[in-house]
Amino acid sequence: MIMKRTILLCLPTILLLVACHQNTNQANTTKNSSTVISTTSSQSTSTTSEQSTSSSTSAETNQEATSTETQVNFNGSYYSVQGKYGEVIIANKKHPLAADYAPGENPEALAAFQRLIADMQALGFGISNNYSGFRSYETQANLYQSYVNQEGQAAADTYSARAGYSEHQTGLAFDLLDTSGNLLEEPNASQWLATNAHLYGFIVRYLPGKESSTGYMAESWHVRYIGQEATDIYNSGLTLEEYFGVPGGDY
């Protein structure tokens, strides 16, 4: 009887110890779970950081690729770059033409130019059938010297090319004239030309505010034949130099 009472008296103590042991295990389990969650969170943060670094590196790589300049080639007569649809001749103050390079007017460019003139005339613009197209090295030398004699070299260099540096020598450039024989400057006709020249494969070569790129003052009358890629250049709003990433500006 005494033993039974002793057991009964000890039973609450035993149950209390068991309960404490269970609580301790649960606490340890919770602590371990928290540790796992914390570790997983840390790993996730590390992964996110790595992904961010990877994205940053990728962006820097793309930026470097975009800023890469186009390779300019020289074949002994002229400089050129490879465009989307073929070779594009570059003639500016940094890229001269050989003195003996005399291709005449490019047949494809001339045909497109004549269509351009005909369409402008049909729309009522006062455009002459006469124009200024191909010029030989010698012709350009005489023309440039006449401007130098009149206004000095510094002034002449802002609007006339020295011999060997003129786009007219490529046979791909044309100056439009009005019916009075003057270079085309009439605002409505000039605006139409600037907006629509690319549909005929041309770009208005010397744009306003782009003297530091092209090397010349704006010329609303001077168009340069490019072909199909003229539309890409027009839509970009860039000069030929800026579009292809080639050096331009002054001599």
What feature does the model see in each segment?
Residues 4-10:
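Sec-dependent signal peptide recognition
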Residues 16-19:
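C-terminal motif of bacterial Sec signal peptides marking the signal peptidase cleavage site
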